[in-house]
Amino acid sequence: ATQDSFLSVVLKYRCQILFTTRSNLNEYCTFQLKEIQDINILFQLTSAFYSEADKYRSTVEKIIETVHYHTFAVELAAKLLENGISTPGQLLAKLQEERASLDNEDKIKIIKDGQSSKATYYSHIHTLFSLYALSRKQQDIMCNLCFLPYTGISARIFTKWLELPTLNEINDLIETGFVQTTTRHTISLHPMIKEIALSETKPSVSSCHILLDSLQKICLMHGIEVDYYKKLFQTAGNIIELIEKDDIPKYLLFLENVFPYMDNYNYQKGMKAIIQELKYFLKRKDIGTDSDRALLLDFQATLEIKPEKAIKLEKDALAQIENITADNARLVSNLHANLGGLYRMNGHPDLAREHMEKSISLLDQFNLLHINDSIPQIANYAMFLTEQQEPERGISELQKLSGIIKEYHSDDCLDYAKVQETLGTIYLMTANLPQAKTHFKRAFKIYEKIWADEPEMIEAKYQEIQELYPQVGFFLGQQLSDFLTKQT
């Protein structure tokens, strides 16, 4: 897919060996030369251009690490030290501060691909990778690729995120060397290329709105899980760290929509990052709404391990909203449900019932009973009813909920599994072990499928059940363990 017009001319010379960074020639025998990772070899390269390299060896090695072992960048840094006025320590500090956007006026001469030129370090890096030669569409793709995790992601998934009609543009970037790929069609950016793309394209909320919208859509598809959720969360984390926040309302909405999906998988690293980001922006009174501030307090309560502190946070969240409207009824309902759940955990059944029933009544009042938020609310309410010696009511509510989930989503999603687990728990609490086993098996079959690559999550769920009910936990756990080992 390369656009190099002279490639066909070069091939006519019948070369025995052709060195190129521009094309992927599948019809020929090829050998891939990768970056040199040996620090000693790269130090020798530095010494060839910088006469005092031995004197400052430790600093020079840190410079090599900072430019990600890229031979051309190492050579540039060495020549800058030999001919410029910067000391190794000053250059290292500048590199660590600005990385690929180094603004150094010292002119250096270098030969690359047969051409001699003078430029600053910054200009040389950009000349090497030819970012200016990319089409506008390719620059947009590079801009969004900056957020991918270091391990990369499926090219087809990324194409869907950007709503690209074909893989052609990405394939072109792969052939020119800007995008790395593996045999499994995973794409990523070399760290140095990523830094150049960041400094050149300056990704922002506005320019990357398609990507942000796509990630939010996935997070809002309640009951539908994706097997690449960890890479999705890592991408969101990179967005938080790297993107220019030029549209604050849209950015806050992105954070608020991603957090619950992370909570679904207990991805605390990302949840904590979102909370810190929201706290940073919402400390200013001219940014955000009452609902934004209520959500921040609710998110903080989610990660708070002390019940009394979590209760205070939820009460403070409710206090942020003075008037309940159609726009905020869903949020207020969730806050009441969360507060009711905390009161239940902290041994206040009357307050728990009050807030749980308030949350469900708000959903009913504003015609919201069909939405996904009703799932955890009804499940928790059913558990509460069982604890209050009303298990039949709780089981009835959950059976209705199972039917709704199966009708509107499926019977192999995480929501369905959670309801089955809750049913199993209620039957266990009422000493109906055969029914408990049936529902736990249904739940664990789904957990095993969704968490196939993370057996520790299945084990944690099993341990959770054992710890809650030690009197029957070993017996049930052994049955579940036998059941799981028989799954294929």
What does each model-found stretch correspond to?
Residues 84-104, 136-139, 198-224, 228:
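A eukaryote-biased feature capturing mid-to-C-terminal, repeat/solenoid-rich segments of large proteins
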Residues 33-76, 90, 168:
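Amphipathic alpha-helical segments of the small helical/lid subdomains adjacent to P-loop NTPase cores
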Residues 75-82, 125-201, 208-213:
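C-terminal boundary/linker of central alpha/beta nucleotide-binding cores
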Residues 1-50:
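A conserved switch/coupling segment of P-loop NTPase cores
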Residues 42, 80-138:
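Loop-to-helix "switch" segment enriched in basic
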Residues 256-263, 291-305, 330-345, 356, ...:
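Conserved alpha-helical positions within TPR/SEL1-like repeat arrays
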Residues 207-288, 292-294, 309:
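Extended alpha-helical scaffolding segments used for macromolecular assembly and cargo binding
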